């Protein structure tokens, strides 16, 4: 046992001071190495120290590592209803509208001026529309009269054309008729011949 601990004792390292870390002495290094050798050594367990036992597999969780599993709420419970009541809330009261602020004299004058302006603008616009409507109606009447005169003139021209066509047909009938005698061959109607000078 002593020979094994002597063979496994690490070599003494030079002491170096590193800022931010604590320096270990040789006594502390030797004590920690001996504890590791006694705990992990091949010899049997010593008195007064816990022995290490290696088991293949995962390490078991301790009591401090166990976490309580969340439990689902039972489904037969009714849904939770939250009722909120505000302090000072009274039921059955009707909210009355706030009274309108009193209008000043300037605001009244402005309202009257605005009403007069609206009335004048509406009257002017309606007058313009009425005059335009009368002018459009007069133009429509004149257009209707001109249309009637044009229709009458077209009817007169159509009648005159019909009369002229009838007269032309009658003249053609008279010119082409053979029932009338030829007045050029009637005896006694021939012109007298001049006998000439006598000797």
From Swiss-Prot:
Bias (Acidic residues): 23-38
Q: Give the matching Pfam families.
A: BLOC1S3
- Main localisation: cytoplasm
Q: Region (Disordered) spans which residues?
A: 1-81
Q: Where in the cell is it found?
A: Cytoplasm
Locate the compositionally biased regions of type Low complexity.
39-54
Residues modified to Phosphoserine: 64
Per UniProt, the ranges with Basic residues bias are 1-11
Give the record's keywords alphabetically. Cytoplasm, Phosphoprotein
Q: Which residues carry this modification: Phosphothreonine?
A: 62
Q: Which GO terms describe its cellular component?
A: axon cytoplasm; BLOC-1 complex; transport vesicle
Looking up InterPro entries in the UniProt record yields: BLOC-1_complex_su-3 (IPR017245)
| UniProt modification remark | Phosphorylated.
Superkingdom, according to UniProt? Eukaryota
> Can you cite a GO biological process for this protein?
endosome to melanosome transport
Q: What does this protein do?
A: Component of the BLOC-1 complex, a complex that is required for normal biogenesis of lysosome-related organelles (LRO), such as platelet dense granules and melanosomes. In concert with the AP-3 complex, the BLOC-1 complex is required to target membrane protein cargos into vesicles assembled at cell bodies for delivery into neurites and nerve terminals. The BLOC-1 complex, in association with SNARE proteins, is also proposed to be involved in neurite extension. Plays a role in intracellular vesicle trafficking.
The text of the family note is: Belongs to the BLOC1S3 family.
Q: Quaternary state and partners of this protein?
A: Component of the biogenesis of lysosome-related organelles complex 1 (BLOC-1) composed of BLOC1S1, BLOC1S2, BLOC1S3, BLOC1S4, BLOC1S5, BLOC1S6, DTNBP1/BLOC1S7 and SNAPIN/BLOC1S8. Octamer composed of one copy each BLOC1S1, BLOC1S2, BLOC1S3, BLOC1S4, BLOC1S5, BLOC1S6, DTNBP1/BLOC1S7 and SNAPIN/BLOC1S8. The BLOC-1 complex associates with the AP-3 protein complex and membrane protein cargos. Interacts directly with BLOC1S2. Interacts with BLOC1S4, BLOC1S5 and BLOC1S6.
Q: Spell out the protein name for this chain.
A: Biogenesis of lysosome-related organelles complex 1 subunit 3
Protein's organism: Sus scrofa
């Amino acid at each position: 046992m002593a020979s094994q601990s002597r063979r496994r004792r690490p070599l003494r390292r030079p002491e170096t001071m590193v800022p931010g870390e604590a320096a270990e002495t040789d006594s502390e290094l030797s004590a920690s190495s001996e504890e590791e050798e006694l705990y992990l050594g091949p010899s049997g367990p010593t008195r007064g120290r816990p022995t290490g036992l290696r088991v293949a597999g995962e390490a078991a969780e301790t009591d401090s590592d166990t976490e309580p599993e969340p439990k689902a709420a039972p489904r037969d419970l009714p849904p939770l209803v939250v009722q909120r009541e505000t302090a000072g809330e009274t039921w059955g009261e009707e909210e009355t509208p706030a009274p309108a602020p009193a209008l000043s004299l300037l605001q009244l004058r402005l309202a009257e001026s605005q009403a007069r302006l609206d009335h004048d603008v509406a009257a002017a616009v309606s007058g313009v529309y009425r005059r335009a409507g009368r002018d459009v109606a007069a133009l429509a009447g004149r257009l209707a009269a001109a249309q009637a005169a044009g229709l009458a003139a077209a009817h007169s021209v159509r009648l005159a054309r019909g009369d002229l066509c009838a007269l032309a047909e009658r003249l053609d009938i008279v010119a082409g008729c053979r029932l009338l005698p030829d007045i050029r061959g009637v005896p006694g109607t021939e012109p007298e011949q001049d006998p000439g000078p006598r000797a």
